[in-house]
Curated annotation (Swiss-Prot), chains A, B:
UniProt cross-references to Pfam families, sorted A to Z: ArgJ
Gene designation: argJ
Localization terms from the record: Cytoplasm
Main localization of the protein described in the UniProt heading: cytoplasm
This enzyme's EC code(s): 2.3.1.35, 2.3.1.1
Catalytic activity of the protein: N(2)-acetyl-L-ornithine + L-glutamate = N-acetyl-L-glutamate + L-ornithine; L-glutamate + acetyl-CoA = N-acetyl-L-glutamate + CoA + H(+)
The entry's keywords: Acyltransferase, Amino-acid biosynthesis, Arginine biosynthesis, Autocatalytic cleavage, Cytoplasm, Multifunctional enzyme, Transferase
Organism domain of life: Bacteria
Residues of the active site: 180
Record-given protein name: Arginine biosynthesis bifunctional protein ArgJ
Site (Involved in the stabilization of negative charge on the oxyanion by the formation of the oxyanion hole): 107-108
Protein's job: Catalyzes two activities which are involved in the cyclic version of arginine biosynthesis: the synthesis of N-acetylglutamate from glutamate and acetyl-CoA as the acetyl donor, and of ornithine by transacetylation between N(2)-acetylornithine and glutamate.
Binding site for substrate: 143, 169, 180, 266, 392, 397
GO cellular component, one term: cytoplasm
Organism: Thermotoga maritima (strain ATCC 43589 / DSM 3109 / JCM 10099 / NBRC 100826 / MSB8)
Amino acid sequence: MFTPRGFKFAGVHCKIKRKRKDLGIIFSEVPCVAAGVFTTNVVKAAPVIYDMEILKKNPNGIKAVVVNSGVANACTGEQGMINARRMAEKTAEELGVPVESVLVSSTGVIGVQLPMDKVENGIEEAARVLSNDPLPFAEAIMTTDTKVKMHSTKVMIDGKEITVLGIAKGSGMIHPNMATMLSFITTDAKISEEALKKLLKLSVDDSYNMIDVDGDTSTNDMVIVLANGLAGNTTIQPETDGFWKLYEAVHEVNQVLAEKIVEDGEGATKVMEVHVINAPDIKSARLIARSIVSSNLVKTAIYGEDANWGRVIAAAGYSGATFDPEKLDLFFESEAGRIKVAENGQGVSFDEEEAKKILSEKKIRIILDMKQGKETAKAWGCDLTEKYVEINGRYRT
Amino acid sequence: MFTPRGFKFAGVHCKIKRKRKDLGIIFSEVPCVAAGVFTTNVVKAAPVIYDMEILKKNPNGIKAVVVNSGVANACTGEQGMINARRMAEKTAEELGVPVESVLVSSTGVIGVQLPMDKVENGIEEAARVLSNDPLPFAEAIMTTDTKVKMHSTKVMIDGKEITVLGIAKGSGMIHPNMATMLSFITTDAKISEEALKKLLKLSVDDSYNMIDVDGDTSTNDMVIVLANGLAGNTTIQPETDGFWKLYEAVHEVNQVLAEKIVEDGEGATKVMEVHVINAPDIKSARLIARSIVSSNLVKTAIYGEDANWGRVIAAAGYSGATFDPEKLDLFFESEAGRIKVAENGQGVSFDEEEAKKILSEKKIRIILDMKQGKETAKAWGCDLTEKYVEINGRYRT
């Protein structure tokens, strides 16, 4: 894992959870330009409301993010807001930075107040053990995740080597009260506030916003990007060459993390990747890709290894996009091969044995060629299994 | 079951399906004013496209509906349109009525052409056995439904006794390629075309449009109302006294049928009824009720008899409606009692034993009091079970 210059990480166990690490800090030696994308849920957790305010006031002066897992600090009213602010204050005290330079994040059960004594002890300890190793932080933000989710890459811009490192969590298949998706991207690129905002929005629309585990949007979802400028490149402005180079790097990180989130669910046995190609416009392409990947009927068909093309076409049809259904070609693809199952909106005869072989793989691509434009979109999801129902039916608040 | 004056029904087995009845006709002795609401899916089955055209051209002259089950005639291209039209022609020939007075409907597997020889034999036979008994028709439109779905009521308008009879099918839990929702309402009321259209739209918005079985919208869904005027009342005009009286009767029929559709699914063990009350506006009330009833996490919680209020609040939050989450009160209710689980958007302590007892019933009401307006909406759905996944994962195209 590459670590961008000037960032330090920590993850500790402060006993919000019984055994595993539950509190983490990211710290930058110098102030960062920061941008965030937050849950669209009307019911927003206290840290989400807190961070939106901080990023409005101080987008060029962020020095730290403090995150706890185990308790979401959502549906917690006024006391929740006081606790979110206290997390920032305590972190600022321990790190010797201004309060308004600290962002806060939580993930875990809804409707429970944070145990602030434990949280404050955790912050003290984490501030003492900051290091170049991002792994303890990645572990500390996990809830029901079974795997750590990190990805990094490097890119040359303006003769300078720039590093991008992303750390995420999210696992909707298991205890979905804890299904929050969190992602923290750090980079040593130098970039303007406007450019960073634009870049993050563009990338999120084609990564985290295109994954579906169970269709339910958490109260705590957030993606934060911190750029501390230590690579020493000329400040990147919107839609310049440097902008697109950094975009590619950040987007690689976000797409890899989004796929890792989809892959990681005990209930899931398969990953679906839906490609919508030759769509009339980008909005329709995205609507259709998301609709297919979110359909319970498509999810169960993939689980059952059934080349049920009618369900895919129907899901495209109710996506909300307007299009000519009589132009659609549909393919299923995997390591084992590729098969055409529909042409011009109608089924074609295909070898059931071959289809079965293709669908028996772990990663299935569903390719919908709309033949009515040039836009494309990709979405990722997983299958729907008895295990999902079992786990979510049994889970107790 | 009350039957409106002048309507006759038939249902026969013409071997599209192996054993059960698969072709039905509704016939009115005199021309009907007719209105229809059709699937919003962009991918529309041939009979849907055909009927939309007929109702545009001839809304005051409908005399019959012919319906087959077993094959949906969806994703069947030009041949599908030819076959839909041929069903109407054959029915018109056998009944001695104009072709443009016949509506067509299909439900069953997608992507397969109708076996027209069997269908035509079925139409011949059905036309011969028309009677006052609606039961054979109700049986003939079933696919994976385990129960016949009919409801009738009477209302006095203008000194005349008016009868409304509805016959429906729909069962998304089992073989969802056949999950089409069909509903045919017959009445002997005399009503203007404009009034009938308005009345149907109003009622559908608060009945069929508020049920969720698996979130997937069929290519074949349709609701048709036929009014033949034989009750002899003065023609009902929009928003008169008579209009609202007939609305109440039709709406009773539609709500009962909608609930029967939700109840009938082998995979389902419980029915949920979501009441959103004191909402800021009707659109928000409906969005929120539908969002809750469609949430996989709420569905599995109900299945698991878990008073997981956080999932309900979160589903309200991502519904797309804008509201103040800090005003929400939430209750679970059933035959066994009623319990408050959240107040002003936050959890309240409640007796877990009592909650368990309430949620162990077959019919669960979730009541969300928004305390920010006067509008209400109801939605119906069922739980999500391992059985649903098992059935849909195994089902083969």
